[in-house]
Amino acid sequence: MSLTLWQQCLARLQDELPATEFSMWIRPLQAELNDNTLALYAPNRFVLDWVRDKYLNNINALLNEFCGANVPLLRFEVGSKPVAQAISQPVMVSAHASAPGVVSRPAPTRPSWDNVPALAELSYRSNVNTKHNFDNFVEGKSNQLARAAARQVADNPGGAYNPLFLYGGTGLGKTHLLHAVGNGIMARKPNAKVVYMHSERFVQDMVKALQNNAIEEFKRYYRSVDALLIDDIQFFANKERSQEEFFHTFNALLEGNQQIILTSDRYPKEINGVEDRLKSRFGWGLTVAIEPPELETRVAILMKKADENDIRLPGEVAFFIAKRLRSNVRELEGALNRVIANANFTGRAITIDFVREALRDLLALQEKLVTIDNIQKTVAEYYKIKVADLLSKRRSRSVARPRQMAMAMAKELTNHSLPEIGDAFGGRDHTTVLHACRKIEQLREESHDIKEDFSNLIRTLSS
């Protein structure tokens, strides 16, 4: 009975929730029905609190639907059910998996991550930046899932999300999260061997090992770490020997229950020049996108950065900067640094007029690059239609969806009002523009393809 009940709940929740959310929060749960009490076991307190806060109503509604008058009492616990009595085992799937199923991957060869002794004879270069942690990472809708996944990995390395693959454009916080995970793991286990590096460093180390006839030492070094954090994995493209060695390193680490975290500027399957067998393995754990920050997050980033520098930044000034610079966090912080430097040099107060002057060239370039005309041309080219189609009255999906996307882009990337955007799209009403923006926002939550289109277009228009 309990097996059928929880499987029914899983099937419905997978239909109702975005794939990433289902894989990250629901799949790891184990269930047991005993004495009219349904116990759900979460791998750690973080998952338990998140599920109870975000999905309790969904689960209760399904229990009421499936059980009628005999609804069991729902109880949450941290831990796992003893194997002999376990009802549903957690299944590790990619965030983009379309159906439940066991992922084909090697079983860990060591039972507990915590019980592995440190290898004192090897000298490790951690390279983890202690300045980057979860506390100073500004969370928003665009990066919420990525931060949550990274936090879980830091709390439970070598667990359900192995490997963790983070992808998104430049300057969105992927590297910050890598370092935050590294710091989190080492805070929990000070003697952990955590190694952070750019993918090019892996290539350089391998080349040096080949030159010095030290390839066995190279293998031993990388295969004995507790956690390997590699940035910009796309730079492995077309480096066949490096890919071959990383393939075997990857397998060895997973078999040893050692944590792997990778970042890239694109979704794993879209990385050109990387072998399919590697791209397949990249998706064995959890794949999460980081998108450009929305307005509220950009404002929060500016305010936090100013606070770290003991600078009083008026809210209207932060909003002014955030509304005009939209591409990534790095650009925002660079602009704020310039404003702060100018204020220190001149002794002037930071006002909107002062920011206009300090960032004159940057703002002028941004306004020149991102216009509604430019957006229309870029979107039309991306979807292989004509600009005239976007302005027409045609309602076919092949035209209507790109038109909605272009309107959403115009609202996101320009300072034009909704009526002005509507006028630029064939004299449409502002309510049509508002509907388009809300529709695209909804589809970004439901469709991986729409989310990718949005991110690709933002990246193109903001570069």
Curated annotation (Swiss-Prot):
CDD domains: AAA (cd00009), Bac_DnaA_C (cd06571). The keyword Secreted does not apply. Residues 127-343 are annotated as: Domain III, AAA+ region. Residues 344-463 are annotated as: Domain IV, binds dsDNA. GO terms for biological process: DNA replication initiation; regulation of DNA replication. Keywords: ATP-binding, Cytoplasm, DNA replication, DNA-binding, Lipid-binding, Nucleotide-binding. Residues 83-126 are annotated as: Domain II. GO terms for molecular function: ATP binding; ATP hydrolysis activity; DNA replication origin binding; lipid binding. HAMAP family: DnaA_bact. Oligomerizes as a right-handed, spiral filament on DNA at oriC. This is Chromosomal replication initiator protein DnaA. The gene is dnaA.
